[in-house]
Amino acid sequence: MRLRRPLIAVAGLAAAALALTACASGTTDETTSASDSVAGTGFPITIEHAFGETVVESAPERVATWGWGSTEAAISVGVYPVAVAEQSWTVGEGNLLPWVEEAYDAAGVEHPVVINDDEGGATIPYEEFIEAAPDLIIAPYSGLTEEQYDTLSDIAPVVAYPEAPWTTPWDETISITATALGLEAEGDAVLDEIHGYLADEAAAHPEFEGKTFAGVWDGDGLVYVYTEADPRISILTELGLEVAPSVAELDTTDGGFFYELSYEQLDKLDADFIVNYSSSQEEAEAFLTKPETQAIPAVAAGKVAQVYDPVTVSSVSPPTALSFDWAGGMPALVTAIAGVLAE
Protein backbone atom coordinates (compact mmCIF):
# COMPACT_ATOMS: atom_id res chain seq x y z
CA MET A 1 0.00 0.00 0.00
CA ARG A 2 1.37 3.39 -0.96
CA LEU A 3 0.43 6.12 1.50
CA ARG A 4 -0.73 9.39 0.01
CA ARG A 5 1.74 12.07 0.98
CA PRO A 6 0.39 15.57 1.62
CA LEU A 7 3.46 16.98 -0.15
CA ILE A 8 2.35 15.18 -3.32
CA ALA A 9 -1.43 15.24 -2.99
CA VAL A 10 -2.10 18.77 -1.78
CA ALA A 11 -1.01 21.55 -4.09
CA GLY A 12 -1.38 24.20 -1.43
CA LEU A 13 1.23 22.57 0.76
CA ALA A 14 3.71 22.26 -2.08
CA ALA A 15 3.98 26.03 -1.97
CA ALA A 16 5.60 25.64 1.43
CA ALA A 17 8.75 24.73 -0.43
CA LEU A 18 9.21 28.35 -1.37
CA ALA A 19 8.81 29.40 2.22
CA LEU A 20 11.91 27.65 3.46
CA THR A 21 14.16 27.29 0.43
CA ALA A 22 16.71 29.87 1.49
CA CYS A 23 18.15 27.35 3.91
CA ALA A 24 20.77 25.63 1.84
CA SER A 25 22.63 28.81 0.98
CA GLY A 26 22.57 29.88 4.62
CA THR A 27 21.05 33.25 3.67
CA THR A 28 18.10 34.79 5.47
CA ASP A 29 17.34 38.12 3.80
CA GLU A 30 14.91 36.86 1.15
CA THR A 31 13.18 34.03 2.98
CA THR A 32 9.42 33.93 2.53
CA SER A 33 7.49 33.35 5.73
CA ALA A 34 6.14 29.84 6.13
CA SER A 35 2.86 31.37 7.22
CA ASP A 36 2.48 32.93 3.76
CA SER A 37 2.03 29.51 2.18
CA VAL A 38 1.12 27.08 4.96
CA ALA A 39 -1.91 28.03 7.01
CA GLY A 40 -0.49 27.57 10.49
CA THR A 41 -2.92 28.77 13.15
CA GLY A 42 -3.31 29.34 16.86
CA PHE A 43 -0.12 31.24 17.64
CA PRO A 44 1.34 31.73 20.13
CA ILE A 45 1.59 27.98 20.81
CA THR A 46 2.97 26.53 24.04
CA ILE A 47 4.60 23.10 23.95
CA GLU A 48 5.35 21.39 27.27
CA HIS A 49 8.32 19.04 27.40
CA ALA A 50 10.88 17.43 29.69
CA PHE A 51 12.76 20.68 30.24
CA GLY A 52 9.77 22.95 30.81
CA GLU A 53 7.83 24.61 28.04
CA THR A 54 8.53 26.39 24.78
CA VAL A 55 6.42 29.16 23.32
CA VAL A 56 6.28 29.46 19.54
CA GLU A 57 5.17 33.05 19.09
CA SER A 58 4.37 32.96 15.37
CA ALA A 59 4.54 30.72 12.32
CA PRO A 60 8.23 29.84 11.89
CA GLU A 61 10.01 30.79 8.70
CA ARG A 62 13.19 28.74 9.14
CA VAL A 63 12.74 25.38 10.85
CA ALA A 64 15.63 23.16 11.92
CA THR A 65 15.23 19.59 13.15
CA TRP A 66 17.37 17.42 15.41
CA GLY A 67 17.19 13.75 16.31
CA TRP A 68 14.92 11.39 14.41
CA GLY A 69 11.55 11.67 12.68
CA SER A 70 10.83 15.38 13.05
CA THR A 71 12.23 16.19 9.61
CA GLU A 72 9.76 13.80 8.01
CA ALA A 73 6.95 14.96 10.30
CA ALA A 74 7.46 18.56 9.20
CA ILE A 75 7.58 17.62 5.53
CA SER A 76 4.41 15.54 5.86
CA VAL A 77 2.47 18.67 6.82
CA GLY A 78 4.10 20.77 4.11
CA VAL A 79 7.04 22.41 5.89
CA TYR A 80 10.54 21.74 4.53
CA PRO A 81 13.21 22.33 7.20
CA VAL A 82 16.16 24.55 6.36
CA ALA A 83 18.54 22.38 8.40
CA VAL A 84 18.34 18.73 9.45
CA ALA A 85 20.40 16.38 11.59
CA GLU A 86 22.90 14.17 9.82
CA GLN A 87 22.11 10.45 9.84
CA SER A 88 25.67 9.28 9.27
CA TRP A 89 25.16 5.67 10.39
CA THR A 90 22.42 5.24 7.83
CA VAL A 91 23.59 7.16 4.78
CA GLY A 92 27.06 8.51 5.57
CA GLU A 93 28.28 12.01 6.28
CA GLY A 94 26.45 14.93 4.73
CA ASN A 95 23.75 12.88 3.00
CA LEU A 96 19.98 12.84 3.34
CA LEU A 97 17.87 9.81 4.12
CA PRO A 98 16.54 8.49 0.79
CA TRP A 99 12.88 9.14 1.60
CA VAL A 100 13.75 12.67 2.74
CA GLU A 101 15.79 13.38 -0.38
CA GLU A 102 12.95 12.00 -2.49
CA ALA A 103 10.48 14.36 -0.80
CA TYR A 104 12.60 17.47 -1.39
CA ASP A 105 13.23 16.50 -5.00
CA ALA A 106 9.56 15.69 -5.66
CA ALA A 107 8.56 19.12 -4.36
CA GLY A 108 11.36 20.90 -6.21
CA VAL A 109 12.87 22.17 -2.97
CA GLU A 110 16.55 22.90 -2.56
CA HIS A 111 18.11 20.44 -0.14
CA PRO A 112 18.57 21.54 3.48
CA VAL A 113 21.80 22.08 5.34
CA VAL A 114 22.86 18.79 6.94
CA ILE A 115 24.09 19.45 10.48
CA ASN A 116 26.92 17.19 11.62
CA ASP A 117 25.83 14.46 14.03
CA ASP A 118 28.37 11.65 13.82
CA GLU A 119 28.13 10.93 17.56
CA GLY A 120 24.42 10.21 17.83
CA GLY A 121 23.65 13.52 19.49
CA ALA A 122 26.36 13.23 22.14
CA THR A 123 27.75 16.53 20.93
CA ILE A 124 25.98 19.31 19.07
CA PRO A 125 27.73 21.63 16.58
CA TYR A 126 26.15 24.84 17.82
CA GLU A 127 28.02 26.92 15.27
CA GLU A 128 26.27 25.06 12.47
CA PHE A 129 22.90 25.84 14.03
CA ILE A 130 23.87 29.49 14.33
CA GLU A 131 24.90 29.57 10.68
CA ALA A 132 21.61 27.97 9.61
CA ALA A 133 19.76 30.74 11.50
CA PRO A 134 16.60 28.81 12.42
CA ASP A 135 13.70 30.47 14.20
CA LEU A 136 12.50 27.12 15.59
CA ILE A 137 14.35 23.88 16.43
CA ILE A 138 12.19 20.76 16.63
CA ALA A 139 13.61 17.74 18.50
CA PRO A 140 10.81 15.68 20.09
CA TYR A 141 12.59 12.36 19.44
CA SER A 142 16.19 12.99 20.39
CA GLY A 143 18.73 12.60 23.15
CA LEU A 144 19.05 16.25 24.11
CA THR A 145 20.52 16.91 27.53
CA GLU A 146 19.28 19.85 29.54
CA GLU A 147 22.58 21.64 28.93
CA GLN A 148 22.24 21.12 25.19
CA TYR A 149 18.65 22.28 25.32
CA ASP A 150 19.63 25.46 27.18
CA THR A 151 22.44 26.25 24.73
CA LEU A 152 20.27 25.64 21.67
CA SER A 153 17.54 27.79 23.21
CA ASP A 154 19.93 30.73 23.01
CA ILE A 155 19.84 30.25 19.23
CA ALA A 156 16.11 29.62 18.75
CA PRO A 157 13.13 28.18 20.63
CA VAL A 158 13.54 24.42 21.04
CA VAL A 159 10.80 21.79 21.20
CA ALA A 160 12.24 18.85 23.16
CA TYR A 161 10.86 15.41 23.99
CA PRO A 162 7.90 15.14 26.39
CA GLU A 163 9.42 12.76 28.94
CA ALA A 164 12.58 10.71 28.32
CA PRO A 165 15.20 10.80 25.55
CA TRP A 166 14.73 8.52 22.56
CA THR A 167 11.36 7.17 23.73
CA THR A 168 8.77 9.51 22.20
CA PRO A 169 6.19 7.40 20.34
CA TRP A 170 6.32 7.79 16.56
CA ASP A 171 2.82 9.27 16.44
CA GLU A 172 3.61 11.82 19.16
CA THR A 173 6.67 12.89 17.18
CA ILE A 174 4.35 13.72 14.31
CA SER A 175 1.70 15.41 16.45
CA ILE A 176 4.21 17.46 18.46
CA THR A 177 5.92 18.64 15.29
CA ALA A 178 2.66 19.53 13.58
CA THR A 179 1.37 21.35 16.66
CA ALA A 180 4.57 23.39 16.99
CA LEU A 181 4.13 24.47 13.37
CA GLY A 182 0.51 25.50 13.92
CA LEU A 183 -0.60 22.64 11.68
CA GLU A 184 -2.27 20.32 14.17
CA ALA A 185 -5.16 19.44 11.85
CA GLU A 186 -2.75 18.53 9.07
CA GLY A 187 -0.81 16.35 11.50
CA ASP A 188 -4.01 14.61 12.53
CA ALA A 189 -4.73 13.85 8.87
CA VAL A 190 -1.29 12.29 8.44
CA LEU A 191 -1.81 10.18 11.56
CA ASP A 192 -5.27 9.09 10.44
CA GLU A 193 -3.79 7.81 7.20
CA ILE A 194 -0.95 5.95 8.90
CA HIS A 195 -3.22 4.43 11.55
CA GLY A 196 -5.51 3.35 8.74
CA TYR A 197 -2.58 1.65 7.02
CA LEU A 198 -1.68 -0.18 10.23
CA ALA A 199 -5.28 -1.23 10.79
CA ASP A 200 -5.42 -2.59 7.25
CA GLU A 201 -2.22 -4.58 7.82
CA ALA A 202 -3.56 -5.95 11.10
CA ALA A 203 -6.80 -7.00 9.40
CA ALA A 204 -4.82 -8.66 6.62
CA HIS A 205 -2.83 -10.67 9.17
CA PRO A 206 -5.21 -12.06 11.80
CA GLU A 207 -2.48 -14.56 12.70
CA PHE A 208 -0.58 -11.69 14.36
CA GLU A 209 -3.22 -11.28 17.07
CA GLY A 210 -1.81 -12.14 20.49
CA LYS A 211 1.54 -13.41 19.24
CA THR A 212 4.40 -12.33 21.53
CA PHE A 213 7.71 -10.95 20.35
CA ALA A 214 10.92 -9.28 21.45
CA GLY A 215 13.03 -6.87 19.43
CA VAL A 216 16.78 -7.28 19.83
CA TRP A 217 20.20 -6.17 18.61
CA ASP A 218 23.18 -8.50 19.05
CA GLY A 219 26.05 -6.57 20.61
CA ASP A 220 28.50 -9.49 20.39
CA GLY A 221 28.83 -10.46 24.02
CA LEU A 222 25.47 -9.11 25.06
CA VAL A 223 22.10 -8.61 23.46
CA TYR A 224 20.19 -5.33 23.60
CA VAL A 225 16.48 -5.94 24.14
CA TYR A 226 14.26 -3.00 23.24
CA THR A 227 11.65 -2.00 25.80
CA GLU A 228 7.98 -1.55 25.04
CA ALA A 229 8.58 2.19 25.37
CA ASP A 230 10.83 2.11 22.30
CA PRO A 231 8.82 3.31 19.28
CA ARG A 232 10.16 0.59 16.98
CA ILE A 233 8.52 -1.89 19.35
CA SER A 234 5.30 -0.06 20.21
CA ILE A 235 4.50 0.38 16.51
CA LEU A 236 4.37 -3.40 16.08
CA THR A 237 1.73 -3.72 18.78
CA GLU A 238 -0.63 -1.81 16.49
CA LEU A 239 -0.54 -4.85 14.21
CA GLY A 240 -2.04 -7.01 16.97
CA LEU A 241 1.30 -8.30 18.23
CA GLU A 242 2.18 -8.24 21.93
CA VAL A 243 5.49 -7.54 23.61
CA ALA A 244 6.53 -10.75 25.36
CA PRO A 245 6.02 -10.71 29.15
CA SER A 246 9.63 -11.86 29.47
CA VAL A 247 10.72 -8.46 28.15
CA ALA A 248 8.85 -6.56 30.87
CA GLU A 249 10.26 -8.94 33.46
CA LEU A 250 13.78 -7.79 32.60
CA ASP A 251 12.86 -4.45 34.18
CA THR A 252 15.00 -1.33 34.21
CA THR A 253 15.05 1.64 36.53
CA ASP A 254 16.88 4.05 34.25
CA GLY A 255 13.94 4.88 31.98
CA GLY A 256 15.94 3.83 28.92
CA PHE A 257 14.72 2.27 25.71
CA PHE A 258 16.61 -1.01 25.95
CA TYR A 259 17.77 -3.66 28.38
CA GLU A 260 21.11 -5.45 28.27
CA LEU A 261 21.28 -9.23 28.49
CA SER A 262 24.57 -11.07 28.66
CA TYR A 263 24.84 -14.20 26.58
CA GLU A 264 24.61 -16.19 29.82
CA GLN A 265 21.11 -14.78 30.44
CA LEU A 266 19.56 -15.26 27.01
CA ASP A 267 17.35 -18.12 28.14
CA LYS A 268 15.27 -15.48 29.97
CA LEU A 269 14.03 -14.14 26.65
CA ASP A 270 10.95 -16.23 25.91
CA ALA A 271 8.69 -15.13 23.04
CA ASP A 272 6.78 -16.58 20.10
CA PHE A 273 9.28 -14.92 17.78
CA ILE A 274 12.16 -12.46 17.70
CA VAL A 275 12.68 -9.38 15.54
CA ASN A 276 16.43 -9.08 15.09
CA TYR A 277 17.92 -5.79 13.91
CA SER A 278 21.41 -5.92 12.38
CA SER A 279 23.69 -3.63 10.39
CA SER A 280 24.41 -6.27 7.71
CA GLN A 281 23.19 -9.57 6.33
CA GLU A 282 26.33 -11.23 7.67
CA GLU A 283 25.54 -10.08 11.21
CA ALA A 284 21.94 -11.20 10.82
CA GLU A 285 22.99 -14.67 9.72
CA ALA A 286 25.56 -14.90 12.52
CA PHE A 287 22.83 -14.19 15.06
CA LEU A 288 21.01 -17.32 13.91
CA THR A 289 24.04 -19.60 14.11
CA LYS A 290 25.90 -18.53 17.26
CA PRO A 291 25.80 -21.24 19.92
CA GLU A 292 25.09 -18.58 22.55
CA THR A 293 21.97 -17.18 20.86
CA GLN A 294 20.50 -20.68 20.58
CA ALA A 295 19.62 -20.23 24.26
CA ILE A 296 16.78 -18.00 23.09
CA PRO A 297 13.91 -20.46 22.48
CA ALA A 298 12.59 -18.60 19.43
CA VAL A 299 16.04 -18.53 17.83
CA ALA A 300 16.49 -22.26 18.41
CA ALA A 301 13.09 -22.79 16.77
CA GLY A 302 13.98 -20.61 13.79
CA LYS A 303 11.34 -18.02 14.66
CA VAL A 304 13.29 -14.87 13.77
CA ALA A 305 12.23 -11.97 11.54
CA GLN A 306 15.36 -10.27 10.25
CA VAL A 307 15.82 -6.54 9.63
CA TYR A 308 19.26 -5.63 8.36
CA ASP A 309 21.35 -2.97 6.62
CA PRO A 310 21.38 0.63 7.87
CA VAL A 311 18.73 2.08 5.55
CA THR A 312 16.23 -0.72 6.18
CA VAL A 313 16.82 -0.71 9.93
CA SER A 314 16.43 3.06 10.04
CA SER A 315 13.22 3.02 8.03
CA VAL A 316 11.50 1.03 10.81
CA SER A 317 13.41 2.24 13.90
CA PRO A 318 10.88 3.66 14.27
CA PRO A 319 9.03 4.40 11.03
CA THR A 320 8.61 8.08 10.28
CA ALA A 321 5.90 10.01 8.51
CA LEU A 322 7.75 9.42 5.22
CA SER A 323 9.31 5.98 5.72
CA PHE A 324 6.21 3.97 6.63
CA ASP A 325 5.79 2.66 3.13
CA TRP A 326 9.46 2.59 2.16
CA ALA A 327 9.59 -0.61 0.10
CA GLY A 328 12.31 -2.36 2.08
CA GLY A 329 11.06 -1.17 5.46
CA MET A 330 7.70 -1.64 7.17
CA PRO A 331 6.07 -3.60 4.31
CA ALA A 332 9.06 -5.96 4.22
CA LEU A 333 9.05 -6.34 8.00
CA VAL A 334 5.34 -7.21 8.01
CA THR A 335 6.01 -9.80 5.30
CA ALA A 336 8.94 -11.23 7.26
CA ILE A 337 6.86 -11.56 10.44
CA ALA A 338 4.06 -13.22 8.50
CA GLY A 339 6.56 -15.67 7.06
CA VAL A 340 7.96 -16.54 10.48
CA LEU A 341 4.51 -17.12 11.97
CA ALA A 342 3.49 -19.27 9.02
CA GLU A 343 6.36 -21.70 9.56
Where are these regions (language model features)?
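N-terminal export and membrane-targeting signals
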Residues: M1-A15
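Bacterial lipoprotein signal-peptidase II cleavage site
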Residues: R5-I8, L20-T41
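Extracytoplasmic substrate-binding proteins
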Residues: E53, E147-D220, P319-E343
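Basic- and aromatic-lined ligand-binding clefts that recognize polyanionic substrates
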Residues: R62-T65, S70-A74, G187-V247
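A short, structured surface patch at a secondary-structure boundary
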Residues: T71-Y126
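Extracytoplasmic ligand-binding site segments that recognize negatively charged/polar headgroups
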Residues: S88-L96, L144-E147, Y161-I176, K211-L236, ...
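Proline-aspartate-enriched helix->loop->beta-strand connector
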Residues: F129, A133-A139, P157, L266, ...
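Structured C-terminal subdomain patch of bacterial secreted/periplasmic proteins
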Residues: T179, L269-E343
